[in-house]
Amino acid sequence: MAGHSKWANIQHRKGRQDEKRGKIWTRIIREITVAARTGGGDPSANPRLRLAIDKAKAANMPADRIKYNIDKASGTLEGVSYEEIRYEGYGIGGAAIIVDTMTDNRVRTVAEVRHAFSKYGGNMGTEGSVAFQFKNVGQIIFAPGTSEDKVMEVALEAGAEDVITDDEGAIEVLTAPGDFEAVRDALGAAGLQPEVAEVTMRPENTIALEGDDVARMQKLLDMIEDLDDVQEVYHNAEL
């Protein structure tokens, strides 16, 4: 199945992550902390913690640091308590934006997120104002040049819902959140290594931006992503 090109967006995101690895680690540590506190410190019995550990390994976080943060969150050591808060709003051209945060000070966080929205012409919405435009899915993306036939065969056999190839040849595998790990592991066992593998909020439809609106939207997204309390940013703009 064909789809819009998203390869440039992936490369932009990976480039920014490489530039700020320390911040990526901070976000992952927060995710490990919340996952371990809510579901326990045993990864085999805590899917959310398993995914957080996978993110940590992908970001080259040392194993002893991963273990330390799991132990800390599980109650062995004293730590900071984080609250998960989701904000929703609109960016340039009415594009929908979801901002997931983990914070120890919700007053600070909402002020910073609201400021980022307003600085570049966006605006905060109410709870539920844009979330209905997204679907929670497992997403596994392969670089252009990967065998589409092989990905499709393995993914669908393992329980994937859809396989989409974009205009540049990048291949996107979509799964139900509960099937994500099984599909990802089956693809890995077949020698297929993805560029992206995560459970995410995927837009049901996208909004095309043109001219200066593209740069303005990217600046808005970058500013939100750079906020200390922000974990993930989802949007439906074509950039």
From Swiss-Prot:
Its main location: cytoplasm. Signal peptide: none annotated. It is found in: Cytoplasm. InterPro entries: Integrase-like_N (IPR017856), TACO1_YebC-like_2nd/3rd_dom (IPR048300), TACO1_YebC_N (IPR049083), Transcrip_reg_TACO1-like (IPR002876), Transcrip_reg_TACO1-like_dom3 (IPR026564), YebC-like (IPR029072). Keywords: Cytoplasm, DNA-binding, Transcription, Transcription regulation. Residues 1-21 are annotated as: Disordered. GO terms for molecular function: DNA binding. One of its GO terms (cellular component) is cytosol. GO terms for biological process: regulation of DNA-templated transcription. Belongs to the TACO1 family. This is Probable transcriptional regulatory protein Ajs_1898. The lineage of its organism: Bacteria, Pseudomonadati, Pseudomonadota, Betaproteobacteria, Burkholderiales.
